[in-house]
Amino acid sequence: MRGAIRIVESGCLARPARAALGVGKFQLRHVIDSAVSAVFDVDLRDLRAPTRGSTRAAFARQVAMYLAHVVCGLSLTEVGALFARDRTTAAHACRLIEDRRDDPELDGRLEHLERAVACLFDALIARRG
């Protein structure tokens, strides 16, 4: 978690349509899952499970879908495919997370995650270039 905090404090800003910049879907999913897993203390296996799993794992997965859509600029269809879910499931996840941003604690976590995922992608893109 300390590493994620340092990344967040570096001040990287999210840019839309990161997926179009040549970062592979596997890398995209790995970066998002790793960040969400660390912040919400959910095992990666639970986050990637084909079934809904625990309430905690399902919520963390919804956050991951939200980040893929908002930070990485994926369409809801692409988010659904990335997480082996339907497009409507991805849409529901994004609406749910957006509605819950009124909670200051959750909103703070989401802001940190957005910056962290953006920074990690900046690093991946720089390495590829």
Q: Where does each model-flagged region fall?
A:
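Short alpha-helical "recognition helix" segments of helix-turn-helix
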Residues: 77-83
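Intrinsically disordered, low-complexity basic tails/linkers immediately adjacent to helix-turn-helix/homeobox/MYB/SANT
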Residues: 6, 14-18, 100-129
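Short, amphipathic alpha-helical "recognition" segments used to contact nucleic acids or chromatin
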Residues: 58-73
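General nucleic-acid-binding
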Residues: 1-34, 128-129
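DNA major-groove recognition helix of helix-turn-helix
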Residues: 69, 93-94, 98-101
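Helix-turn-helix DNA-binding elements, focusing on the entry/boundary residues of the two helices
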Residues: 33, 75-76
